[in-house]
Amino acid sequence: MKKSISLLLLSLLMITPSCQKTKEAANEYNIVPKPNQILPQEGRFELNNKVCLVVPSDAPEVKSIAASLAEQLKLTAGISLKEAESADGKTAISFVVQEGMPKEGYKLSVTPSLITLTASQPNGFFYGVQTLYQLLPPAIYGKQLDKKADWSVPAVEIEDSPRFVHRGLMLDVCRHYVPIDYIYKFIDLLAMNKMNVFHWHLTDDQGWRIEIKKYPKLTEIGSKREKTLVDYYYVNYPQIFDGKEHGGYYTQEQIKDVVAYAASKYINVVPEIEMPGHALAALAAYPELSCDSTQTYKVSPTWGVFEQVFCPSETTFKFFEGVMDEVIELFPSEYIHIGGDECPKTAWKNSAFCQQLIRQLGLKDDTTPSKIDGIKHSKEDKLQSYFVTRMEKYLNSKGKNIIGWDEILEGGLAPNATVMSWRGVEGGMNAAKAGHNAIMTPNPYVYLDYYQEEPEIAPTTIGGYNTLKKTYSYNPVPDDADELAKKHIIGIQGNIWREYMQTSERTDYQAFPRA
C-alpha cells in the first residue's frame, strides 16, 4: 500500500490552522496528523552505519524511546546506530531535552548531517519519533529487512504540539468480540498517529467482556450469546441470524498486559462499564440486579435499546462497587467511563421499589426547564442522576473521576463528571458552558460504523452516511463558542461501534481512513 494511504489513518485529531505553504508541505511529506509548522529545507539525511545516536544520560525514559528507534532501524534497514556523548562533528540523531516546551510538543530538525529531536517530556519525544517514522520509507513499520528502500530523510523543520489533551478512539468489543492480538494492533495505530486515549467499551447488552473475579457469572454467562443478527436492523425488517454462539472475554492478566503496552506508547486506556442501561449481559448472569428478578434475561443477539436496565437498589450498588474495585486495580487511568446512555425508564416507572425510592429521595418532575439543557426532566430522569452521582461519589473516594455519555446531563449532572457528547454537539456545549469538561464525539461526524460509500455497493452497516470529507471537516470547538466553552472542551474522539464488524479486517475497512 502506498505510503500516502498507509499514513492516512486516525487523523481526525490535533486539528491546527496553518498557512498555505504549510498545508502544501504537509501534503508533500505525508505527515499525519498535520503538524503546526513544517518548513521544507534542502537536501537529505542519509541513514547508514556511520550515524551516531546521542541521548542525554540522565533521561532514562528518553533513552528507552531512542533505543526503540535504533532497534527498528536495525530490524528494517539493517543500520546499527553508534552511541555517542555529543553530536559535535558527527553525522547524528540527537535527542535534546529543552524545558518550557508544551508537554506533548516536539521540534524535529533535519539537515543533511544532523537530525535533532527536541522536547521537554518523554511523550513529546515519542511523538517526534512517530513523525520521523512517517518521513522514512513505509518499510520502517515492518518486521523484516528491506535493503531496497531509500533509507534517507528529507531535510525539514517541524514544530508540533496537540490542540487537545484528549485525543481518543473508542473500540466496541461487545457487539463482536475482538481477539487480543487486534487490540495490540489497534494501540499501535493510535500511537502511530499521536492519539493518547484508548476508550475500551467492555460491557453492553451483547456481551460482558471483562473478567470480574467476584462475579464469575459475568463471563461464564454474560460473555456468550446464542446467535447474532447478520442482516439489516430495522423494526419492520425480517431479522436474519447466523445461528452460531458468539463469545469471548479478556482475563485480568490480559488486560494488565494491554494497559502496560499502551502506557509504553503514551496511551491511556479508559474502560467503559455501562450503567444503568445496556444491562442485558449482566442481568442474564445476575437477574437480581434488575427491577424484576422473576424474569429470564438473555444476552442480546441483536442491536438497539432495551427496557431491561439495572435497578437502583442497594444490591445493584453493592454489585457495582465490587466490579469497580477490580476495574480500578486494572486501569490506572484517572477516568472510568460509566456509560449512562440510552436508559429507558419504563422498568423504573413500573417498579414499586423505584417509585418508593423516588418519593424517599424527594424527586419530582420538573416544572421549569433545566438551566443546563433547557429541557423539563422527569423524576425518573432524576433517579438516573442519583444513580450516576452515587457511583461518581464511590469512584471519587477511590481517586477516580467519571466520564459519561451526554444523557448524564438529564436530571442534573454529577458534580465532577466529564461529558462525552455523542447526540450531536449540544450536550458537550451545554456541559462546557456549565463549567464541566466535555469531549466531543458527535454522531454522525465521528461515528465510524456508518456507511462511507453508496449503500448499494457497500457491506451492511447500522445505517447512516458519513463521508471522509464530513469527518475531516468537523471542528470540535465551534467558532462562536465562548471562552468558558473553549476552556472546557478538552478533546475529541472517534467511535467504532461494531454491530456488523465481525472481523478485524472489517473493522479496519469501516474505521479507516475516516478515523
Label the model's feature ranges.
Residues C19-F164, R506:
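Contiguous, structured surface segment used for ligand recognition
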Residues G100-Y335, R390, Y394, H488, ...:
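Feature activates predominantly on carbohydrate-active enzymes
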Residues V62, P179, W208-I210, A279-A281, ...:
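Extracytoplasmic/secreted cell-surface and envelope-processing proteins
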Residues A282-E288, D292, Y297-A417, W422-A434:
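Active-site neighborhood of glycoside hydrolase catalytic domains
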Residues N401-A417, W422-R514:
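Flexible, acidic glycine-rich loops studded with aromatic residues
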Residues C174, T203-G207, E274-H278, D341-K345, ...:
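Active-site beta-loop-alpha junctions enriched in small/polar residues
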